[in-house]
A protein has these predicted regions:
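Conserved class I S-adenosyl-L-methionine
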Residues: 145-156
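N-terminal auxiliary segments of SAM/dcSAM-dependent transferases
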Residues: 1-110
Length: 312
C-alpha cells in the first residue's frame, strides 16, 4: 500500500522507488540481507524492472487531454474509466532486452490514483488506454507514415495519435466487431481533431490484409496479450508478402519474439527438435545460434513458424 511504501521510505531514508522495490522483493520471498542468488535476482531484475511513473506525464498525453469517455452502457458494453490505485502494479512497457540475454519485465506504479479509459463487455475488461498501452505504442506511432492501415480499433489511441502527424495522410481502421465501431463512432470519433483523416471499415483483419492496396504503414493490434497474440501474429506475418510496399508494425512484437525465443530455448533444453528448431534449421556454431535467436533473426523466420507453436 501507499502507507507501506512511504513508511519504509521514511524509516530507512530511501526513495519511494527503492522502498517499493524492496517491498516487492520481500513479497516474492527474496532475502537481500543474505549472500545468495536472491541478491543477484534483485539486482539484475527488480532494479531495472520496477518504475515509479509520473501520472502528470501520462495525463499530458494528447489522447488523455482530448478524449473524455462518458459512463454509458449499451448492448452488454460499458464505457468509462478504471481506477488504478496508488502503488497498484501494472505492466509498464515491453520486455527490456539486455545485451547479456536478460529479458526483464517492466513493472510500473503511481503514488496516486489514476483513471484510465476502459471498455468492458459483459463485465470483462476488453479495451483500455493505460500507461502500458501508451508506452508500448510510442515507437510504432513514431514510425507511421503516409496512408496507414490500423488493424484493431480498441479505444482509438493509435489512430488518434497517428492522425495528429502531418506526415500521415489517411488512417483506415479495420475492426471486425460492429458494436465496437458503433460505440467509437458515437462517443469517441467526434472528439478527434483530425477525424477527417479517419475511415472505419468493418472487416476481418486477415481477409482485409490479404487484398489491401495503397498503404505505406500497417499497424496490427488485434490481441490482448502475448499468449493470445502469438498465433495471430504468425498468421499476419504470412500475409506481409501480399503488400510488399507496406511496412508492418505489431503491438508488443518484442515480447512475442521473446516468447518464441523462449520456446526455442525450451526445445534445446529438452533436446527436442520441435517446431522452432525445425524452422531455424542447421546451426553452425554458438554465434550463429545467437544470431538466429535474436529479435531480428526470429522476426525473419516468423512467417514460416508453424502455428502449432502457439498451442504448446
Amino acid at each position: 500500500t501507499l502507507d507501506d511504501v512511504q513508511g519504509l521510505a521514511k524509516d530507512c531514508r530511501l526513495s519511494t522507488r527503492d522502498a517499493y522495490r524492496l517491498l516487492c522483493a520481500a513479497a516474492c520471498g527474496l532475502d537481500e540481507e543474505a549472500e545468495s542468488e536472491d541478491q543477484g535476482m534483485e539486482r539484475d531484475y527488480f532494479r531495472p524492472g520496477i518504475h515509479e511513473l509520473d501520472p502528470a506525464e501520462c495525463r499530458a498525453d494528447p489522447y488523455y487531454q482530448t478524449i473524455r469517455l462518458p459512463n454509458v452502457q449499451k448492448n452488454g458494453w460499458r464505457m468509462g474509466y478504471r481506477r488504478i490505485e496508488p502503488c497498484e502494479a501494472f505492466t509498464a512497457d515491453n520486455l527490456l532486452l539486455l545485451p547479456d540475454g536478460r529479458e526483464v519485465p517492466q513493472l510500473g506504479y503511481f503514488l496516486e490514483a489514476f483513471d484510465a479509459p476502459m471498455v468492458e463487455q459483459d463485465g470483462r475488461e476488453w479495451m483500455t488506454v493505460t500507461p502500458s498501452e501508451r508506452n508500448t505504442m510510442l515507437g510504432d506511432i513514431a514510425a507511421a507514415r503516409g496512408n496507414v492501415a490500423v488493424f484493431g480499433l480498441g479505444l482509438g489511441y493509435y489512430a488518434f495519435m497517428v492522425s495528429q502527424k502531418p506526415e500521415v495522410a489517411r488512417v483506415t481502421v479495420i475492426e471486425r466487431d460492429p458494436a465496437v465501431i458503433a460505440l467509437f463512432r458515437e462517443y469517441i470519433l467526434p472528439q478527434f481533431p483530425n477525424r477527417q483523416k479517419i475511415t472505419l471499415v468493418q472487416a476481418d483483419a486477415y481477409d482485409y490484409a490479404a487484398h489491401m492496396q495503397g498503404f505505406d504503414t500497417a499497424y496490427v493490434d488485434i490481441w490482448h496479450d502475448v499468449l493470445d497474440g502469438v498465433e495471430m501474429y504468425l498468421k499476419m506475418k504470412r500475409l506481409e508478402p501480399a503488400s510488399p510496399q507496406t511496412r508492418f508494425l505489431y503491438w508488443i512484437e518484442p515480447s512475442m519474439l521473446a516468447w518464441l525465443r523462449g520456446m526455442a530455448l525450451m526445445e534445446i533444453a529438452e533436446n527436442e527438435t520441435g517446431p522452432m528448431l525445425q524452422t531455424i534449421g542447421p546451426v553452425r556454431d554458438y554465434d550463429d545460434l545467437c544470431e538466429k535467436l535474436s529479435q531480428d533473426g526470429i522476426r525473419r523466420i516468423a512467417a514460416r513458424i508453424p502455428l502449432e507453436i502457439a498451442r504448446r
